[in-house]
Amino acid sequence: QIDVESTARTILIRIREKGAFSSGSALLNTSFVSVIDKIAGALAQIEGRIAVEGHTDNVPINTFAYPSNWDLSSARSVAVVRRMLDVAPLPPSRLTASGFADTRPQAINTTVDGRARNRRVEIVVKQPLDEQSGAMLREIR
């Protein structure tokens, strides 16, 4: 239920809803807490800003706790950030939490599988420029 992608200075960790959260909930599944703990421990060892982003499918939610998918996606990202801060020596200034609701789908929302792929939390690590890249950018400016 976890995918990891890496480019030059970005690491993307994609967590599918089914592993981390029950449907319509922002409470981390107890079976998944250790996974978040490992991710947090690993991220504490590297530099960079960490953006935790919550995403949903386009099926409306309207509960007392989560009146909309905006609320649910935001609450899920905050739950992950809180857990990471609780278990790893991460400065809070390195982390942000954002909810995107259904505005950034990965798949079409017309199928069960597509909706499942869209329900996710992504941890995006933006690593700082190395000295050579930084010098090159300064020259361009």
Language model segments and positions:
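Periplasmic OmpA-like peptidoglycan-binding domain that tethers envelope proteins to the cell wall
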Residues: R14, A20-V33, H55-L137, R141
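Short secondary-structure junction motifs
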Residues: Q1, E47-R49, P92, N118
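Structured segments of extracytoplasmic/periplasmic soluble domains
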Residues: I39-R49, V80-R83, V87
